[in-house]
Amino acid sequence: AGDVIPQVIGVVKEKRRKDSIVYCAPKYCPSCNSITFKPSGEAVRRCLSGVKCPAQTVEKLKHFVSKNAFNIDGLGEKLIEMLFEEGIIKDFADIFSIYKCKDRLEKKVGLGKLSVSNLLDSIESKRKITFEKLIYALGIRQVGETNAKLLALQYNTFENFRIEMVKAEDKTSNSFQ
């Protein structure tokens, strides 16, 4: 604890194995085939499709239900993947209307009446969570738990937050400039 984290400043080519191959990041997303882009100052390439990319949508759904976000018991990564593939959930809102597919869920391998009932109860119990957890659950880039708390304190209500986020997207607005 308290140690200095070293910064990578270059490659020591003399230490590289002779048979090593230069890594080339993919120019196209392996999920949706959209062009990838590496923003200046960032270490990773990103798919430019956003929520249109199935892989990004699935990962956002996983984050949304994760322990530090909505913390929905019984709705783990594998189940999210299966429900997305079957078209049962496509976005955050679908999670809260999944009860409409109760009969369909009960027929799935590994899911029975009791586990589906427990899942629906768990989802129902999370209809109200703290504002900071909601902000964190949205998976906004560079908004972790600490920034989510700060945003919740700043805006107090979801409506205030929503209004400011709409302003921030408006190129004619003075917000966040």
Enumerate the predicted regions with their spans:
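Flexible glycine-rich surface loops and low-complexity tracts that mediate binding to linear polymers
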Residues: A1-Q7
